[in-house]
Amino acid sequence: MKFPIYLDYAATCPADDRVAEKMMQYLTRDGIFGNPASRSHKFGWQAEEAVDIARNHIADLIGADSREIVFTSGATESDNLAIKGAAHFYQTKGKHIITCKTEHKAVLDTCRQLEREGFEVTYLAPKSDGLVDLDEFRAAIRPDTILASIMHVNNEIGVIQDIEAIGKICREHKVIFHVDATQSVGKLPINLAELPVDLMSMSGHKLYGPKGIGALYVRRKPRVRLEAIIHGGGHERGMRSGTLAVHQIVGMGEAYRICKEEMAEEMAHVTKLRDRLYNGLKDIEETYVNGSMEHRVGSNLNISFNFVEGESLMMALRDIAVSSGSACTSASLEPSYVLRALGLNDELAHSSIRFSLGRYTTEEEIDYTIDLVKSAVKKLRDLSPLWDMFKEGIDMSKIEWSAH
């Protein structure tokens, strides 16, 4: 067993060896290093063919047409292109957007920027299990609503939104529907030939591909139009200019190809280990799972350990790589905005740990993690006067703490 044990796959995944090997063939002069936009010689043709093959692999995994795949620098850019691109293109029809308070920052901050430009955004509060209330979503739609953005799987709590039902509501009201599928592609079956989704963001590195590459699915029928946010040579059908990073695209394509072949087996393995972890930790007193266990991706477990400070617990768990909150916000000492949106108090939000499992997680690592977490929580609670008071039956909420 190698230390520290990596249980932060929702932050990033190592590139699969097969992906890294494939990418190396597109970097040096012995390989295929051409610019796919060079149409007058073999170097360009070979590079273009490699990009086309990768585009097909990505489309195959999600049930799309390869012409609906636009390459970007990652899911953050895909979110920006989808939301800003659609908002700017359709703003003559209306300037109202709907999203959820638990979305990724790439969606929330993009919406905030649009608010500064004069758009109006409704931020829906999720139910306590993390799911969007469909009646509330329907009620939020106005005649001037042009776009809704709801993520498929949450990066912190792993809950799966019913994007089919939300998409149907959007179709009824002719609202464009964007889905951030960064955490669901390769973990859940997705068939865009059937799902009522217009725009979908994807990442390379969350599926054992390289960092710095992502894609945006843009529906052709019914056609969705976007205004570009990066201008230049008109690459990617004018939606995203810039020389295509062939080695990155090939890496992402290979990662998606592998996922299509191995997803069912891999998710069964990961879910079994996640359940083993959950069963090992659920009996610790004052332990709460954040988000629905029923509608949850198999790789995620987010637990709050009451009366334990999250940062102290992280330090006590030096042998395992986990996070409190998401990787994008885990450096801040603010409690997770996702958990606060579920209605958790600051104490519980602060004491949460996200375990995210992946392709290379083993049973041995999970058993070690269970033992380590149990002993760390016990040790920290033994040092906590709050835990003593709780055990004595004192109601914490009724105590008036004096300020010094």
Curated annotation (Swiss-Prot):
Pathway: Cofactor biosynthesis; iron-sulfur cluster biosynthesis
Catalytic reaction(s) noted: (sulfur carrier)-H + L-cysteine = (sulfur carrier)-SH + L-alanine
Swiss-Prot/TrEMBL keywords: 2Fe-2S, Cytoplasm, Iron, Iron-sulfur, Metal-binding, Pyridoxal phosphate, Transferase
Entry-linked Gene3D superfamilies: Aspartate Aminotransferase, domain 1, Type I PLP-dependent aspartate aminotransferase-like (Major domain)
Binding-site residues, [2Fe-2S] cluster: 328
Cofactor dependence: pyridoxal 5'-phosphate
Annotated GO biological process: [2Fe-2S] cluster assembly
Cellular component annotations (GO), alphabetically ordered: L-cysteine desulfurase complex
UniProt: pyridoxal 5'-phosphate binding residues: 75-76, 155, 183, 203-205, 243
Compartments it resides in: Cytoplasm
Family statement: Belongs to the class-V pyridoxal-phosphate-dependent aminotransferase family. NifS/IscS subfamily.
Task of the protein: Master enzyme that delivers sulfur to a number of partners involved in Fe-S cluster assembly, tRNA modification or cofactor biosynthesis. Catalyzes the removal of elemental sulfur atoms from cysteine to produce alanine. Functions as a sulfur delivery protein for Fe-S cluster synthesis onto IscU, an Fe-S scaffold assembly protein, as well as other S acceptor proteins.
Name this protein carries in UniProt: Cysteine desulfurase IscS
